[in-house]
Structure formats: C-alpha cells, structure tokens
Amino acid sequence: MSVGNSCIKAFDFARCHVMVERGLSREECEGYVMKEIDFYMVDAFSTETFGGNAAAVCPLIEWLPDETLLKMSQQHNQSETAFFVTTDSGFELRWFTTQGEINLCGHATLAAAHVIFEYLDYPDTTIRFETRFVGPLAVTRSGDWLTLDFPGWDSEPVLPPPLLLEGLGISDYQQVRVARDYMVVLESQQQVEALRPDIHAMIPLGKMVCVTAPGEGEYDFVSRFFCPGEAVAEDPVTGSAHSMLIPYWADKLNKTQMLARQVSARSGDLRCQLVVDRVRIGGQATTYLIGKVLLR
C-alpha cells in the first residue's frame, strides 16, 4: 500500500471513530468512509498509445448502484467504461457509456480482459464473462493477442433511408443492410476513408451506422463506425460491429479467417474468424493509465 493510500485510510478510520463517539451508528458511519476502486485506461485493438479505442476499466468487489456506475462513467468521460465483479464461474461484466448501460461493447471487453490477464494474477488462458444482454462471452489469450468469442449477427438487405445516404454524403453504394446497426457497403477503401458524414443529420435513423468496403493489401475488409446521437460521433475501433461484418464478409469472400482494419483517425487491426454462428475477434491492447477512484 502506498503512503498516500495509508494516509487516506487512516484519515477515514479516525473520522469514523469520532462520528461513532458522537452517536452515529457504525452503519451510518460507513456511508462517510471513502471507497477505493482500481482504475485502468486501456487502448484496445492497438499496441501503441493513442491508437485503437480507449476504454476505462474498473474491477469491483460488488456491484454499486446503477446511478453510481453511470456517474463514474460520466466522470471518466470515455466512450465506454467496463465494470466487472468476480463470480464463482468467472466474471460478471457490464458496460456503460456517459448516457447509460449498453448491451455489448467489444473494445471495452478486450480492455477488461487485458486488465484481468495483466494485473489480477489470472492463471488461465480463457476468461469467461457473464453479461446481462448477450449471454456468456469468452476471451482467450495467445501471446500478445486476445480473442473475443461473440455471437454472430446476420444482416438483411434493405432499401436505404434517404437520411442515411444524405447524412453520409453519398449517392453510390454497393448495398445497404441492417442488423443491430445499418451497414453500408461501398466499392473501395478510399471511399470509406474519404467520408465526412453529417452525424447530426442521421440522428432520426435511430441506429448506428457502419460503413465497409473491401480492404487493400493485407486487409480483407475495412470499416468505419458512426454513432448518431451518442457522445462520440465516430467510434475509433468497434469490436461489436464485427459481429455483423464478419458473417457478411465471410460469405462475400468465401473465407472464414480474415484480417480487418477500422480506418478511423486512431485506427486498429482485428483478426476475424467465423465459427458457425459465432465470431472470433482478435486484438491487442496496451495500458495507458493506472490509478484509483475515490468514492465517498
């Protein structure tokens, strides 16, 4: 324990002792004692600082009230914060944005697994997470790579809403599909990279927007992911979007193992595999910050 933490604990103990002497119950006193929570900020899907997609990660002893988790996420001011608690079978995992809890987040799952493997003396090569909305998830480590095992999502072709094309600023496209999000397929990587969308104009769509195209060089496909109505206009690297992208490109390219790149400003590489109705999404991660959250 550091000197600073020792001083904090000593101060809280002394303050609690005084309150008890003044007639407060031990339970009332505990409400004034500071809680210490480990805090990590991790760049997921990258080996370089400021690359990939940043996520905050907080291991918890037990679940805090949802209101507290949301306020913590707002204070962290990252696109997502991953919270987890240890269970008999593994870990229970939840994700919060600055606006509320979400059903799935790939890069924050990768970041949480990175923290468990690197800092919590986890002995196995596979982590099993229980989640509230998408069931069990697994993350496996092999060397420096972490592989997410996520559900695959089939998408259906649709006629594009005019607001979608107008917001993206395009008239030519190969196909528009929909699953959890809209998926717009373009002809080339250059077209995806050149997009300058009007994010605000797409808010009435009520969905996130993924744009994809065949990749160049070693990459089988590329993508970008836009978030109308969210705090972050463009998500730098979106693991969960590949639950939709991998089944599509596996069918299109007639291959089950692929290398993908999300061509945002921060960018990131993803190893992709389709296994029946599941997808495996591989990435690397690097720690940017380690600290303490102090709650009263």
Spans of model-derived segments:
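Extreme N-terminal basic, low-complexity initiation segments
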Residues: 2-9
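Aromatic (phenylalanine/tyrosine) cluster motif
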Residues: 11-13, 32
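Active-site proximal loop and beta-alpha junction motif in alpha/beta enzyme cores
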Residues: 34-105, 110-296
